UniProtKB/Swiss-Prot annotation:
Principal cellular location given in the protein's record: membrane
Protein name: Putative UPF0496 protein 2
Region feature (Disordered): 385-408
Keyword Repeat: no
Topology term for the membrane: Multi-pass membrane protein
InterPro entries cross-referenced by the UniProt entry: DUF677
Signal sequence range: none
Domain of life of the organism encoding this protein: Eukaryota
Location in the cell: Membrane
Keywords (A to Z) from UniProt: Membrane, Transmembrane, Transmembrane helix
């Protein structure tokens, strides 16, 4: 008889908690994103320093001491350091758009020289519009980064003036606060009109590119069907000519010569002429290359449009949060200096600052990713265009070298 063991079964090992933040950072902050982020911080660190020197005016009484503690000490556990790092990231001056507009214009000139009759097709018009829209999207993202820095400075000045108002400097602080609140919100739709215009153009452009790509696909299919039908008709014509020649050969030898001459002159000559003209005008390979380029452009426009959708929603949230802080400041400005009211305003502004700082930091990251996406999609479209181009002739290479030397 087997005795039952009295030892309790070993407990199931507890799984470690899922590190969502760590997984998110590994997937979100890629190498290209970190390179772009550190590059911007390295070149624009002086922005917050100059702003801090221009706004660090001495204040009398308890409000001045609290303001200095807020700006320099950072009583909430390193908030000042985070603000300094974030405020330095305002404009991305050194961002390089790929491919550059100059290289695109040079490629367009080379393509026109290869043609006998320079004429802009619908495909080229759509591709030019795609590159124009993505270039404007890059400029709009740079302007949005500047607006994010302006929003940080706006809210920081708002906190400073509220601290002065709480410190007893009623008249001057109230006047300065009234002037500051009357300023426009840096994230308002009027201040970011360029961004919203580009955002509105992405979705229709993606639809037009997709429609043009479907049209080219239908044309390529129709061309394949037409070529198959023409080949079948050609084979039938040749077979009929051979049968006619055999029938005529049974009656006279002269008929054989006539049939051979007719066969050599009419069906084969017509077939060679038709094939040569078709090869000159259009080919299924040409349609396939143009369709692949349009497909890459349509995908790129759709992806950029979706990224701008996300950024637009985040801009709206940050705008509402900043506007909430401005409304709270208006309430404090309309009050008569009651201590409980000012304490409640200070508490509300502190909560608003934490939420606004997190939202602006996340918005900056998404704008950086949007810039990287714009470059990646432009490179893919340019790569598809380069695959369809024939190798340049020596005369074209010589002309291009002369243009580069002249421009330099």
């Amino acid at each position: 008889m087997i005795e039952r063991s009295n030892s309790t079964p070993s407990a199931t090992p507890v799984r470690p908690p899922l590190a969502v933040d760590e997984e998110y950072n590994q997937a979100f902050r890629s190498k290209s994103f970190l390179d772009l982020w550190s590059h911007a911080h390295h070149h624009l660190t002086h922005t917050f320093s100059s702003f801090k020197l221009s706004t660090s005016t001495p204040c009398a009484g308890r409000g001045g001491a609290r303001e200095d503690d807020f700006l320099h000490a950072g009583g909430d556990g390193g908030a000042a350091d985070d603000s300094e790092q974030s405020c330095s990231y305002t404009v991305l001056d050194d961002f390089v758009l790929e491919p550059s507009p100059e290289s695109l214009a040079r490629g367009a000139r080379l393509q026109q020289r290869r043609r006998r009759r320079p004429r802009r097709h619908r495909v080229e018009t759509l591709l030019i519009e795609y590159f124009d829209v993505t270039e404007e999207a890059c400029e709009a993202c740079s302007a949005l980064l500047a607006a994010i820095g302006a929003a940080r400075r706006h809210h920081l000045t708002l906190r400073r003036l509220l601290l002065r108002l709480d410190g007893g400097d009623d008249d001057d602080a109230k006047d300065a606060l009234a002037r500051h609140v009357r300023l426009d919100n840096p994230l308002s739709p009027g201040s970011l009109s360029e961004f919203h215009d580009v955002h509105a153009r992405c979705s229709p452009l993606a639809s037009r590119l997709a429609a043009a790509q479907r049209r080219l696909r239908r044309l390529a299919r129709a061309l394949r069907i037409a070529r198959g039908t023409a080949a079948a008709a050609l084979v039938g014509a040749c077979a009929a000519a051979i049968v006619a020649a055999v029938v005529l050969a049974a009656h006279a030898l002269v008929g054989i010569g006539v049939a051979a001459a007719a066969f050599g002159a009419t069906p084969a000559g017509a077939a060679r002429w038709w094939a040569r003209r078709a090869a000159e005008k259009v080919s299924s390979r040409h349609y396939a290359r143009a369709g692949a380029t349009l497909d890459a452009a349509a995908r790129g426009a759709y992806i950029v449009g979706r990224d701008l959708d996300t950024v637009s929603r985040m801009v709206r949230r940050a705008h509402d949060e900043l506007e909430h802080g401005r409304d709270v400041a208006r309430i404090a400005m309309r009050g008569h200096g009651e201590r409980p009211l000012l304490q409640e305003v200070a508490r509300e502004e502190e909560e608003c600052e934490e939420d606004l700082r997190a939202q602006l930091a996340e918005l900056e990251e998404h704008v950086c990713l949007c810039l990287i996406t714009i470059n990646r999609t432009r490179r893919l479209v340019a790569h598809e265009m380069a695959r369809g181009l024939p190798p340049p002739s020596p005369a074209t290479v010589t002309t291009t070298s002369e243009e580069r030397l002249t421009s330099s």
